[in-house]
UniProtKB/Swiss-Prot annotation:
InterPro entries: RecX_HTH_1st (IPR053926), RecX_HTH_2nd (IPR053924), RecX_HTH_3rd (IPR053925), Regulatory_RecX (IPR003783), WH-like_DNA-bd_sf (IPR036388). HAMAP family: RecX. The gene is recX. This is Regulatory protein RecX. The keyword GTP-binding does not apply. One of its GO terms (biological process) is regulation of DNA repair. NCBIfam families: PRK14135.1. The lineage of its organism: Bacteria, Bacillati, Bacillota, Bacilli, Lactobacillales. It is found in: Cytoplasm. Keywords: Cytoplasm.
């Protein structure tokens, strides 16, 4: 087969053959196979050229994708599939990128976990889930997590939550709020509980009473639209109890409030 036309199209070259076949190739392909108009290719040469062209094109796509941030093997492979690169070509590209250290799932997991230690607020369980979603295997994640101390991060997150809710909740509710938030963020129950030891939950009676008054007013405005009488009183009691207020304090307030 003879090449009848070579035309540059942005980043690729259009090649037309005398059998009416056409294909797009990279500049690397042009150079490697010394392609030019009127060059004759046999079937083996043509197949080699097609394979290299897709390999070169796919690798360029992958490098572009990697130029924005670190990616996992799976993320790169999925990206190439979206661009219709053949599976056996994808496997070759991934191997090359690994050998050239463009992609490394273990390093990606390590970087992700270290960045979270500096700027994030996630515990090990959530971190593992996020890394698994990126296609990184457990055996690349678990050793790094096991060597990482999350106690200081848990304390930092708990302090931030404490500062946010201290003037809104009584001690018991505040402890429950912080503990639940830490569990949701992926910290263990033991680590969440331990982080509470560094916080001062002491509130004087007047502070607690003021919080109770505010919460009672808030719940009354909400519930009195639907309920009255004994039902309203029960609903108020339940709402305040769920917020962590003392039973005796609630009963005393409700007797004087209604």
């Amino acid at each position: 087969m003879k090449i009848t036309k070579i035309e540059k199209k942005k980043r690729l070259y259009l090649i037309e053959l005398d059998n009416d076949e056409s294909l797009y190739v990279t500049e690397d392909t042009i150079v490697r196979f010394m392609l030019s108009k009127d060059k004759v290719l046999d079937n083996d040469q043509l197949e080699d050229m097609k394979h290299f062209a897709q390999l070169s094109y796919g690798k360029n796509l992958a490098l572009y994708f990697l130029s924005f941030q670190q990616r996992s093997n799976k993320q790169v492979a999925d990206y190439l599939r979206k661009h219709e690169i053949e599976e056996h070509i994808i496997a070759d590209i991934i191997t090359q990128l690994q050998e050239e250290q463009w992609i490394d799932d273990t390093k990606l997991a390590d970087t992700y976990i270290r960045q979270n230690q500096l700027n994030g607020d996630k515990g090990p369980q959530v971190l593992k889930q996020k890394l698994l979603q990126k296609g990184i295997a457990s055996h690349d994640i678990d050793p790094i997590l096991s060597q990482t101390d999350f106690s200081q991060l848990a304390q930092k997150v708990s302090q931030k939550l404490f500062d946010k809710y201290q003037e809104k909740l009584p001690p018991k509710a505040l402890k429950d709020k912080i503990t639940q938030a830490l569990l949701t963020k992926g910290f263990s129950y033991d680590l969440a509980k331990h982080s509470l030891n560094h916080l001062n939950f002491d509130q004087d009676n007047q502070e607690i009473e003021d919080l109770l008054d505010k919460e009672l007013d808030k719940q009354y405005r909400k519930l009195s639209r639907k309920y009255d009488g004994y039902t309203l009183k029960q609903k108020l009691y339940q709402a305040l109890y769920r917020k962590g207020y003392n039973i005796d304090d609630i009963n005393c307030k409700l007797r004087n409030y209604l």
